[in-house]
Amino acid sequence: MKIAAILMALPLAVLASACATSSSGGAPAADAAAPMVHAKLLAGDGSARGEAMVTQAGDGLHVVVHAQGLTPGMHAVHIHMTGSCTPPDFTSAGGHWNPTGHKHGKDNPDGMHMGDMPNMIAGADGGGEMEYVIPGGTINGGATPLLDADGAAVVIHAQADDNKTDPAGNAGGRIACGVLSAG
């Protein structure tokens, strides 16, 4: 009788355990109350190029970018310091988000900007994904807020970032942009 009760309770225990993890290999589920902002990425002609999500966690800002319609190959992805994406060239987004006053690039001995992130590879279908953690960043408040008075934007560039050339890594033109906002 005890064995039958245990066997009947086992599926419920497995189900409860599954609810406490995400679908990404058993990692803890994301905190639904964690601050989050997102951006719809658009090309200069207004066509959709994907989305970006930034979530605040204990170790910094978790950035996820999903892109489409890109030229196959490497593309720089940066967070820019102004929440403005005026087409067609998106220069209204300003320079890279750099609240700490560093130089550009992970390979620069004086780097790196907080908005510097790894290059994204777009496949033959023009789609690409990139995930990165910005250590010490916050969405609001603290010494390094992403959303200051003039906001912030995510920008995809035409070429790869060389990770050292100041101020922008020789990444070429801005081909997609999205203003980060809550909601």
Can you say where each PLM-predicted feature lies in the sequence?
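Bacterial N-terminal signal peptides
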Residues: L7-S17
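N-terminal leader/targeting pre-sequences
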Residues: I3, S17-M74, I79-G183
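Positively charged n-region of N-terminal signal peptides that target proteins for export
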Residues: M1-L7
